[in-house]
Amino acid sequence: GDVYKRQELDGETDYAVANVAEEASVQKAINKTLEKFGKIDIVLNCAGIGSASKTVGKDGAHPLDYFKIVLDVNLVGTFNVLRLAAVEMGKNEPEKDNECGVIINTASVAAYDGQIGQAAYSASKAGVVGMTLPIARDLGRMGIRINTIAPGIFDTPMMAMASDEVRKPLIEMTQFPKRLGNPEEYALLAM
């Protein structure tokens, strides 16, 4: 199907759906964005996958293919999107403070405080945190600002797949408020 979907928010925003781990898919989404707007001002990287898998569980060793795909989507995919978007942002006319674009990556509290079974997810999100500063230094010369947000536990489609047995202890571990975050709160933080 078509990798590009559109939802009008205020006439000046849109989003593109792509397989972030595939260069051609991301480039197609970028091209569609350029067709509509003529430039890219902001990218919000939110792609992420993961589920619990112990290093050694009752079925044996953690599947290596699973570990690799989590890193492919969460870490390599984040890098793939930002590097291709940065090419286009570098063509923008500088605005206030000579800024040509903004990239916001999504990590996770798991980058700093991973739980049992989160080796792949935590490693991928720690990688997002770890690459942010060197990339910010690299892209700063082009007027591109890059930041990473490491949210706690949010009520996303990925979390919705978890059983109540998994969700309940996670909610109990939160400090305040005693609930999962909602996507609207994250959107307000990012914007």
Regions found by a protein language model. Name each.
Residues 17-29, 64, 184:
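The beta1-alpha1 cofactor-binding region of Rossmann-like NAD(H)/NADP(H)-dependent oxidoreductases
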Residues 1-4:
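Short, small-residue-biased leader/transition segments that mark boundaries at the very start
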Residues 148, 170-191:
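C-terminal helical subdomain
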Residues 50-68, 87, 91-97, 117-120, ...:
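Conserved mid-core segment of classical short-chain dehydrogenase/reductases
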